[in-house]
Amino acid sequence: MLPVLYTGLAGLLLLPLLLTCCCPYLLQDVRFFLQLANMARQVRSYRQRRPVRTILHVFLEQARKTPHKPFLLFRDETLTYAQVDRRSNQVARALHDHLGLRQGDCVALFMGNEPAYVWLWLGLLKLGCPMACLNYNIRAKSLLHCFQCCGAKVLLASPELHEAVEEVLPTLKKEGVSVFYVSRTSNTNGVDTVLDKVDGVSADPIPESWRSEVTFTTPAVYIYTSGTTGLPKAATINHHRLWYGTSLALRSGIKAHDVIYTTMPLYHSAALMIGLHGCIVVGATFALRSKFSASQFWDDCRKYNATVIQYIGELLRYLCNTPQKPNDRDHKVKIALGNGLRGDVWREFIKRFGDIHIYEFYASTEGNIGFMNYPRKIGAVGRENYLQKKVVRHELIKYDVEKDEPVRDANGYCIKVPKGEVGLLICKITELTPFFGYAGGKTQTEKKKLRDVFKKGDVYFNSGDLLMIDRENFIYFHDRVGDTFRWKGENVATTEVADIVGLVDFVEEVNVYGVPVPGHEGRIGMASIKMKENYEFNGKKLFQHISEYLPSYSRPRFLRIQDTIEITGTFKHRKVTLMEEGFNPSVIKDTLYFMDDTEKTYVPMTEDIYNAIIDKTLKL
């Protein structure tokens, strides 16, 4: 009996070791799933309360519990939770009394990062008014489109943006829109001021009755897609979704003693929903900068004693491109939270700036699915959790890049891809994973839905992203469906090509896209390149490099050297104009190169080469 008992005990002792060997991420997977389940349980309980519990309620509690704690840091200014609470009370009262706003009235903010953005937002929450976050880089037609599609009644704008406001003011006035500068004076006829009105009212708490009709499905904020391929769409973010935006901050281990430093624009979900709201939920401090500056980034981190930084897109690469300094590791940053980080930049960043825990995630502003790389595997955007998938029904399906649609079988249903293959990410639309769509009509919302996916009547959210899941269940971003192009019968992922080209020593930044060629099917690869300072272009070196790492069909046949590469406010490359301009040297003033297979180098693009391509006397 004793030998059997000892054998059983030995087996129990060895079980954790065996599980670790066979399933090295099991404990992390279980822990992450339990955290998500707990979050879902909490949100469900918040929805059942009357009134429903929102992010605003948490802020009010933080202001009562820790009134003197620093909440906002901006330049040399420090604002406590109590100060921001009182200022946002004044905002709500001024908008209510002087502007006549009532719950449900949408207000558009057109301004950069500053404390006023935060207390205006909190003031609108206290009124039950949704906020439309306008990108301060947009102008004219795009600005009017964004304003109109959310149904806003009021525009609050920074006086620094007066030229953009004056350009659209006649149209806004015709539509009965009230326009105000967030200032005490105005030099524009027809534009009033709001700060003088805020200054002149009481800072007493706002009655709950002013927002009594707010529910979990009430729109709280409209956040716009980046508009890399057309006019931006206004994603509807309700109070239910605001809660899930904070989960990434919680999952990355941010605590009340942390200082979160962000240079991301507050009109974007990363800064607003993850950074600011995550800060409020844990009771931390939020350090804000008006715009990203690579040269001032670490000085700011030291100034504010930042422990958490946010990044998106190419931001960390910009930091790695700055000249090295002896104090590169002299900071308190321990967590970096964001997305879009290439594996090579990840390695370089932690090697140079220290052992910072980088939490890469995959998500979209409007989407109903997200992943987090909680084991912090370099290069992955997340991890597919077996337990999570049982609840959040998502799949990768085959996608025809040329036809720009999912591949369906003989019965008309979508086809799942096996591990290791690239597929389109979709997620079933359910009560637990809803898709709330876009403001301004149902057409755009319906375009993001896939119907009859695996059976009649089912509906899935189409992420528009091509991903790959490896055999260890780590998830890798491949490309956007609109960015991937087809050449010589093969799919070409622009991100993959850009990563390879970007490894060449003289390349500072690269934007890859496909351009049409008359008389040819598909699109051929082209790369816009920004050169590093004090480096010269070397066509032979680039040819050798891409020939070693890329198949012939995905090598960029044309290069365009630019002084600056145009990006959106969230560091995404703009491609549409470049694609339209193509590779015609008589149209494009930038220096162009053509990949010459015979000479094994890139040669200057000439009219003769262009004409030979058009005449088909030069084979591509």
UniProtKB/Swiss-Prot annotation:
Cytoplasmic compartment spans: 28-106, 289-620
Lumenal side of membrane: 1-4, 128-267
Modified residues (Phosphothreonine): 577
GO terms of biological process kind: bile acid biosynthetic process; bile acid metabolic process; fatty acid alpha-oxidation; fatty acid beta-oxidation; fatty acid transport; long-chain fatty acid import into cell; long-chain fatty acid metabolic process; methyl-branched fatty acid metabolic process
Membrane spanning stretches: 5-27, 107-127, 268-288
Tissue/organ expression: Liver and kidney (at protein level).
Record InterPro entries: AMP-bd_C, AMP-bd_C_sf, AMP-binding_CS, AMP-dep_synth/lig_dom, ANL_N_sf
Keywords annotated in UniProt: Acetylation, ATP-binding, Cell membrane, Endoplasmic reticulum, Fatty acid metabolism, Ligase, Lipid metabolism, Lipid transport, Membrane, Microsome, Nucleotide-binding, Peroxisome, Phosphoprotein, Transmembrane, Transmembrane helix, Transport
Ligase among keywords: yes
Membrane disposition: Multi-pass membrane protein; Peripheral membrane protein
GO MF, one annotated term: ATP binding
One GO cellular component term: plasma membrane
Family: Belongs to the ATP-dependent AMP-binding enzyme family.
Entry function: Mediates the import of long-chain fatty acids (LCFA) into the cell by facilitating their transport across cell membranes, playing an important role in hepatic fatty acid uptake. Also functions as an acyl-CoA ligase catalyzing the ATP-dependent formation of fatty acyl-CoA using LCFA and very-long-chain fatty acids (VLCFA) as substrates, which prevents fatty acid efflux from cells and might drive more fatty acid uptake. Plays a pivotal role in regulating available LCFA substrates from exogenous sources in tissues undergoing high levels of beta-oxidation or triglyceride synthesis.
Name of the protein described by the UniProt record: Long-chain fatty acid transport protein 2
